[in-house]
Amino acid sequence: MPRNIRRLTLAALLAGVVSLPAAAQAPAWPQKPIRLLVAAPAGSAPDLIARIIGDKLGKALAQPVLIDNKPGAGGIVAMNLLKSAPADGYTLALPQAAVVVVTPHTYKEASYDAERDFQTIAMVGKTPMMFVANMAHPAKTFADAVSMAKAKPDQVSVGNPTRTSIPHLAAELVGMKTDAKFQQVSFANTGQGLQAVVNGDIALYTDGVGPLLQLVKAGKLRPLAVASETELPGLEGLPLANKTVPGLNVYGWFILQAPRGTPAPVVQRLNAEVNKAMGEADVVARFREFGTYPTPGTVADAERFLTNEKALFSGVIRTLGLKPE
């Protein structure tokens, strides 16, 4: 064998030998606590959902998952922190739907894109939107409400917890799909909106099932429809919105994300552990308290869902002519 070839072969062998210990000694993930950013204050539904999942992940990974609440600015603070974090699996976020698919279109300061800047790991849970009426209002069904808003444009009021929230956009979507024209009334928070519809200050109200179900069961609000594809446990007998308005399936949701570039093995491990957690009876029961339903699936499932939701809500926002403020 020529001398130069022998030298190249020896160099290659030595390089392989030298690299073996480094690969063998690469530390397994995780080796330290994991930070989980939440774009909502402590005690809120997003915070409590994050703590449920964080507790399960911490036990499965044998490392604490530390909840870091960063509310404000439509979720921009939390998501900017995620965007600038190292892509090493030690900083995650669990944003709610509006933070991911609405804020980038309505806040000038939002410089992130949920698909470009972040690695989606798993869908954690979905909360279907619900349409209710004041008990004295003549609309007995969802079809009644739509017909009334068609016959008398801007005379049937429908409330929502805040402007450009998922409930607000869900109600706007009803009008877009049916040519019904509701009078949209946005409040400062859920409590104000619920009080208004119970008192009869507004006719209808839209929100996630969590805040509404107790009042419906107490006979203080009339359920008109739930905007989910199929009937869900605990909501048996409630009409589906898509029976009146085809394709009207609208949810609030929570999605686990990491900085773009996070190693694939870390992403897959997190996805697997989240799916395990969502199959546990105590998680299902605790989620149900918020009207949230676990949604296990693959990373690809979560990415596909996010793509579809971005398209849906960007279309609604564009049709409404809403601009970043």
Go through the PLM ranges and name each one.
Residues 31-33, 176-180, 217, 223, ...:
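An extracytoplasmic/periplasmic, membrane-proximal ligand-sensing/linker region
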Residues 45-49, 53, 57, 74, ...:
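Stable alpha-helical elements in mature extracytoplasmic
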